[in-house]
């Protein structure tokens, strides 16, 4: 039993050039001794600047990605398959399933900035923890069926997802507001819902992991 996971439309991106000269962005960058466009977009720091961006309510939440990776990767469990991040601007990031994400948020942000600037972390390592792949989301369709977790999807019990098979890639949205992009809608083979209530990204992952481990007889 392996669960392949992809975080979809993830709110993980560098500060776009359109707002790089905004005082809020410059102030944060100076504190960290970095160029504004080399810092991660974060709505808690860049709220006033972001209001000028298209689709801004769906952007600037790298903490969602951080929590999701912590939930899926921290424990040494036998169900971890392939892990990917699909970003809101269409990048596909491969995540080594042996990675132990830093629990400290600021350390994670540093890693994410390095990743988005240089294409992988660590830089020039033959076995990177995370790497931007030169592919599109549609390219993953040749390897997987894609099942998207959505509150409007087909009602299933979490344990049913554990038994789909390793040719399935489970997609969980990693953004705060809004709907999946047309890119996601174009590749989804099936939509699943595991609750009658709206769940946050890390809650969805937690429920699936717990259900799968229970099937395996883990305490």
Swiss-Prot record:
Residues that hold S-adenosyl-L-methionine according to the record:
173, 178, 194-199
Q: What function does the entry list?
A: Methyltransferase involved in ribosomal biogenesis. Specifically catalyzes the N1-methylation of the pseudouridine corresponding to position 914 in M.jannaschii 16S rRNA.
Q: A Gene Ontology molecular-function term?
A: rRNA binding
Tell me the organism's taxonomic lineage.
Answer: Archaea, Thermoproteota, Thermoprotei, Sulfolobales, Sulfolobaceae
Instruction: Write down the position(s) of the site called Stabilizes Arg-61.
Output: 63
Keywords of this protein's UniProt record, alphabetized? Methyltransferase, Ribosome biogenesis, RNA-binding, rRNA processing, rRNA-binding, S-adenosyl-L-methionine, Transferase
**Alphabetized InterPro entries for the sequence:** Alpha/beta_knot_MTases, Rbsml_bgen_MeTrfase_EMG1/NEP1, Ribosome_NEP1_arc, tRNA_m1G_MTases_N
Give the top-level enzyme category.
transferase
Report the EC code(s) recorded for this entry.
2.1.1.-
Query: Positions of the site: Interaction with substrate rRNA?
Result: 61, 100, 103, 107
Say yes or no: keyword Transmembrane helix present: no
* Stated name of the protein: Ribosomal RNA small subunit methyltransferase Nep1
- Coiled coil location: none
**HAMAP family named among the record's database cross-references:** NEP1 (MF_00554)
**Domain of life according to the entry:** Archaea
On assembly, the entry states: Homodimer.
* Catalytically driven reaction(s): a pseudouridine in rRNA + S-adenosyl-L-methionine = an N(1)-methylpseudouridine in rRNA + S-adenosyl-L-homocysteine + H(+)
Query: What protein family does this chain belong to?
Result: Belongs to the class IV-like SAM-binding methyltransferase superfamily. RNA methyltransferase NEP1 family.
Pfam entry (one): EMG1
Enumerate the Gene Ontology biological process terms: rRNA base methylation
Identify the gene encoding this protein: nep1
